[in-house]
Structures are given as structure tokens and as C-alpha cells.
Amino acid sequence: MTDRDYKIAVLPGDGIGPEVMAQAHKVLDAIEQKHGIRFSREEHDVGGIAIDNHGCPLPESTLRACEEADAVLFGSVGGPKWEHLPPNEQPERGALLPLRKHFQLFCNLRPAQIHQGLEAFSPLRADISARGFDIVVVRELTGGIYFGQPKGREGEGAHEKAFDTEVYHRFEIERIARIAFESARLRRKKVCSIDKANVLQSSILWREVVSEIAKEYPDVSLSHMYIDNATMQLIKDPAQFDVMLCSNIFGDILSDECAMITGSMGMLPSASMNESKFGLYEPAGGSAPDIAGKNIANPVAQILSAALMLRYSLGEEAAARDIENAVSQALAAGELTADLAGSKPALSTSAMGDKIASYILNS
């Protein structure tokens, strides 16, 4: 093997997963041809299809394949067929959560942008959406109020209470901050750290540690913003943001807000990574069982997930940009799938994959 041979565990999953993953394969084929990179790709069952074939949503063989890979390209899991199962045995909880835990995927990256030609889909005011935006939300995934102890309920009657605890350790903040600054170096070199340091002790520590880490990256500018102001600024002027660095709960909120203001949630990729840059890359949307098998699903989120994989886990920045530029070219040319075409002629899932692959080869 050369240093540009990569092993990818491909987990198409359920619903539209296999259809859109087939388009990601086409795009990776084009990247191999153009850049001289080689991807060794093996597909494995995960989610509902794994329950049907192996009796559990994350078979040992699938987990082993992920352990032996440089990265995981994930489709989507779930559907009505498996909703009768106990929650922890359903495709989503039984596959994705164990993968995140097993590989210690503490960082979630969610890009959000308005592509040229799709401004009208944004719910933002026309003059704001016309300016466009290109944001990455860097969210800490394994700490904070979702996992802090103690948590629970106690008492009864008027004195019954429930409680959760926001806990962050210095090392957790340091490692997520470094990923935000490294990401900014590949972009416009701006990090905005989101906190509530006027109220929360955890946010005071967050701000202190992020400011310390910023000194390691003198070429990247750092600003701080309170979460309540950030939610407003995203509506008022999203173009001001480049990389938004967030705790678990704040990132949960802001990544969904960023997705919604694009107006095209079906095109957004997502990455979850650990400290060694091993990552799981997937569309931010679901398995869409209602349109599965109809060759009408939008494959762009899956294709852009492959671009994130190239950038963050494999270090192939030029190849990642080629994919993103090809997607932008296709959309700007009005080559759209049914979810975006409206009354205009729509491309099928497979035709969209072909178009994007051809733009890569002809650029």
C-alpha cells in the first residue's frame, strides 16, 4: 500500500441509504481516477438490515470492519419496520450510539451553507439569504449536561424535583477547541466560541480554556458570544460566522438552527471524530423510508459526507474541495433532485450522482 491507499468501512444502512451511498461510490471512483488515490471499500450491514440479517443492529463483523478502517462512511438507519423493538434495540440507538461510544467520537462537525441558486429555499429574509453563508458548527459530543452527574428525580408532591448537572473538564474543552481552530485554518480562519459565561461556571471555564488554546493558533481570530445572542445573530447576519465552537447542548441547538436556515436540510453532511482523527461520516437527515427505492432521493448529503471524510480523517483537502465544487456547480446549473426542483424537471438519484462525478472528472 502507498500512503494514499485508504480503507473505508461503508455502512449503507436502511431506507434511502443504499441508493445515496451508491452515488458516493461514483464520486469516490472519480476522485480515484483524478487524484491517484485508492479507496479500499467494503460494505457491511448496520441498523435495520443488520437486525434482519444478523439479529442485532451492530453485528460484531461490522464493528471489526470499522476498527480496521481509516474512516467510516455511514448511510442512514431506521424505519417503521423496527419501531416495535425496545428502544435500545432499535436501529438508531442500537447502532449509532454504540459506534460513537466505542470509538470515543467526542467531536461533531456540522457544515451549513446556502448554495448558489438555492437562496429562495432559505426561510431568512431575501436580502440576508442573498449574501449567503458558510458555517461549520463544532460541537462537543460526550460531555456537558447530557452526561454530567448527578442527574435524576426525587421527592413527591409540591417538593418533587428533577435535576441535571453541567460538567466540563479542562481536557474536554482543550481537545474540542483544538479541532475548531484546526478546522478554521482550512477555512476563513475565524472561530466564534459560544457560551453563557455571564451565568454558568462551566462556561467561565470554557471561555478561559478556549482563550488559552487560541494562543497556539495566532493565525486564527477568536471571538466569544453568549448563546442567546448567537441564536439571534444567526438569523440577523449568518455570514459573520465561520467556525462556531459549542458545548454539547449549545451545539445541539445551533447546529439545527444552522441547518434550518439553509432551507435544504436534506443536503447537509455530518462528521463525528475522535482524537486520532478517525471519523464516522453521515448525512444529517434520516432514512426517508417513504421514498426508498424510488430513485428520487437527494444524494448530496451523502456525497458531501464523503468530502468531509477526505478532509478530516484522510487529509485529502484538494480532493474534498473537488467534490464540494462539483456539487456547487451542479446546483448552480439548476441540476436538482425532486426535493428542490419544484415544477422543473428533476434529476433522479443516480443521474445526480453521475452529474457530480462528471463535474469532478472535467474540472
UniProtKB/Swiss-Prot annotation:
The main place the protein resides is: cytoplasm
Binding of Mg(2+), residues: D228, D252, D256
* One cellular component term from this protein's GO annotations in UniProt: cytosol
What reaction(s) does this enzyme catalyze?
A: (2R,3S)-3-isopropylmalate + NAD(+) = 4-methyl-2-oxopentanoate + CO2 + NADH
Pfam families, per database record: Iso_dh
Pathway membership of this protein? Amino-acid biosynthesis; L-leucine biosynthesis; L-leucine from 3-methyl-2-oxobutanoate: step 3/4
Which SMART domains does the entry mention?
Iso_dh (SM01329)
Any one GO BP annotation for this protein = L-leucine biosynthetic process
Needed cofactors: Mg(2+); Mn(2+)
Q: Which UniProt keywords apply?
A: Amino-acid biosynthesis, Branched-chain amino acid biosynthesis, Cytoplasm, Leucine biosynthesis, Magnesium, Manganese, Metal-binding, NAD, Oxidoreductase
Q: How is the cofactor bound?
A: Binds 1 Mg(2+) or Mn(2+) ion per subunit.
Q: Which residues bind substrate?
A: R100, R110, R139, D228
What residues bind NAD(+), as annotated? 79-92, 286-298
Q: Name one GO molecular function term.
A: NAD binding
Q: So what EC number does this one have? A: 1.1.1.85
Q: Subunit composition?
A: Homodimer.
Family, according to the entry, reads as follows: Belongs to the isocitrate and isopropylmalate dehydrogenases family. LeuB type 1 subfamily.
Its name, as the record gives it, is: 3-isopropylmalate dehydrogenase
Per the record, the gene is leuB
